[in-house]
């Protein structure tokens, strides 16, 4: 049996990563796992800052890694709607697939700040989707580089 493929996304807040994730999961018949959905169901009232986000996001990662690897080993592809916006995040995601000898693809959703902020404000999540949060998160954003050995679709 061939392992499934791990699909993940790089792009700023509001760039359209989650919209693309939903579409690709549907098109490919893949399992969609969304960080935003998990965090909102488990920790909604507890996340009010970047520090809170990092704390609770890090709590999800070991469980998500194991779950995704089990799915991939059964030949089912996974669309993992978790950010791949820093080199360390991309390394974590690539390692999920590498450890079980699965392929991976990172979709880079490249949008300018103005478009991202406009989309972000349309979402209507006043606790997390703010211009201030956008800038606080975006200062850590880095585009994928060839040296990372990430299969990237631009």
Regions from the language model: what does each represent?
Residues 16:
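Conserved glycine(s) of the Walker
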Residues 12-13:
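The conserved Walker
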Residues 122-154:
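Small-molecule kinase domains that catalyze NTP-dependent phosphoryl transfer to phosphate-bearing small molecules
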Residues 55-100, 104:
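Glycine-rich phosphate-binding loop used to anchor ATP phosphates in small-molecule kinases
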Residues 9:
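Hydrophobic anchor at the beta1->P-loop junction of P-loop NTPases
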Residues 19-76, 115-118:
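Conserved substrate/cofactor phosphate-moiety recognition/catalytic segment
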Residues 100-119:
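Conserved phosphate-donor/acceptor-positioning beta-strand/loop module used by diverse small-molecule
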Residues 1-3:
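Phosphate-binding P-loop
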């Amino acid at each position: 049996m061939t392992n499934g493929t791990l699909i993940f996304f790089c792009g700023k807040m509001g760039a359209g990563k989650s919209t693309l994730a939903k579409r690709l999961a549907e098109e490919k018949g893949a399992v969609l796992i969304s960080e935003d959905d998990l965090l909102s169901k488990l920790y909604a009232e507890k996340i009010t800052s970047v520090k809170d986000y990092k704390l609770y996001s890090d709590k999800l990662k070991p469980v998500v890694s194991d779950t995704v690897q089990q799915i991939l080993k059964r030949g089912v592809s996974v669309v993992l709607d978790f950010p791949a916006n820093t080199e360390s995040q991309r390394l974590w995601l690539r390692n999920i697939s590498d450890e079980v000898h699965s392929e991976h693809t990172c979709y880079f959703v490249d949008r300018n700040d103005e478009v991202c902020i406009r989309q972000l404000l349309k979402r209507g999540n006043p606790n997390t989707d703010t211009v201030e949060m956008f800038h606080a998160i975006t200062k850590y954003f880095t585009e994928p580089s060839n040296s990372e050995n990430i299969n990237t679709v631009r």
